């Protein structure tokens, strides 16, 4: 008898607390991102932490858990833990790689977790509820259009440094080539991989300088690589190169644009802060109950001296 | 008789049969490989032989080349070190942070830079001491110890840099840059340092008692112990030597870009080990040659250079070409085993 009474009492209390928590639902949001292994991902980690602080302050019932992973396997394990241990209601994920993470993400979604995928799409879009991404095509196109406009009717010789062989890099380079093809006087001499790495870009640029006696402009396609490219040009004391365009919005490069540097007149954004946008949109939609747009594209814009200030984050590691 | 008796064909000739010719050729394998590559490169692009290109190639080879000279000692003694790339990155980051913080009290002068260099050598030596001690006294496989530190060093650097870049103060960078970009008698300084390190390494390995001990330990550690060689001490010293080489390479590397990022020195360990092996040092230890290592380091860099100077191979296949050349050079050396 005593036991049954206690059991009834206990379940009444539990039911009460459950209904209480339902009136102010507590939201646990998991964020899974690559660990900071180069400049851009360092920016992602920085902006994710900034967004966590801001969102948790704004919505006291929201708890955000950020996990960083060094590879796809680790990331797959982490999202499994987030779903089973932390009982997350929503997942914001920037996948290390598309194909290997599609199944794990689909499994999490099947458990009723709302999934927002950032930047790198999954191979099966059914595994996600919402998609937030930068515009890789625009990243290449905007840079290419600047080359067309800047080099003008006389055109010129251009060399390109590519990133790492990936779909992202292919999209960017194809869009750049398509944009500069509008001016037949612009000649793309060669495009080799600099692996989004300063040292490799330095070597590739040195060899371009050996090989081509006249280069008018360089599309470094990334700010880390632009660092190496500028040093190689400086070392060779070549005066024929009019300008270098990197991309992604590294703070040092944005600073150069702000200061009116001759060699670095513009930059093209591919902001690591897109993770913060994705987190904000996801949290807002969870809290207010309003559905989130299926696809949100963060545009790649041309940074010039006039608007550089709004892209400058001096505290970010990137 | 006017004609001498023909020697017994079965006994004497084997010493000059194709096999022994191959053996001799095998020793020169890496050099022949490099020459063949240079010829091909010149045919593909005459700019290959310009002084500026050759100096670019040799300067690039200096980083992993200096490390590879130290690595030769470790490998000959029967060890291995997988951590050198991560260690170079950590040293680069640490010395930049140290110099930046010294600027406040010492200014952006030579003193600051010298202290930074000293710190680089000290960190390298300490890391080597740690490796050597853990491997010999702790009795852990060198592969495991250095696999562990490979992860540790890079993680610490990534932590220090918050995943981004650690950048050298601009004023210090200006004063420091001649160490990489400067020339002495028209030769870039990194090449001169590389040559000096190789020369010194060759002397130590072939002309000193210590060098003979290293080779003896690598060829048979047990016998070396019976011969009253201080095996533990000699082994620790090889790792310290390598650590100092890594420090030296980093001292030359830092003024190049004035920054350290988590991708600094990535895969340098494989380049260094490949240079040693291409150069004819046996991976199982016992014997090796410093000059071979130097040629190996230059060969590896040349492949990348040639691929950048030409357009005939799809950029997707660059790594395949490197792999193929490594295997080919090793093939021509196999006569020695």
PLM segments and residue spans:
Chain A
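Bacterial N-terminal signal peptides
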Residues: 8-18
Chain B
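Membrane-interfacial amphipathic/re-entrant helices at transmembrane-helix boundaries
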Residues: 2-68, 102-115
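Helix-loop-helix "hairpin" substructures at the membrane interface of multi-pass membrane proteins
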Residues: 112-120, 124-131, 185-260
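Hydrophobic core segments of alpha-helical transmembrane domains in multi-pass membrane transport
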Residues: 30-43, 71, 120-124, 150-156, ...
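Single transmembrane alpha-helix segments in multi-pass membrane proteins
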Residues: 39-105, 133-140, 280-290, 324, ...
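Transmembrane alpha-helical segments in multi-pass inner-membrane proteins
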Residues: 246, 256-323
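Transmembrane helix-bundle core of multi-pass membrane transporters
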Residues: 142-207, 234-236, 256-265, 309
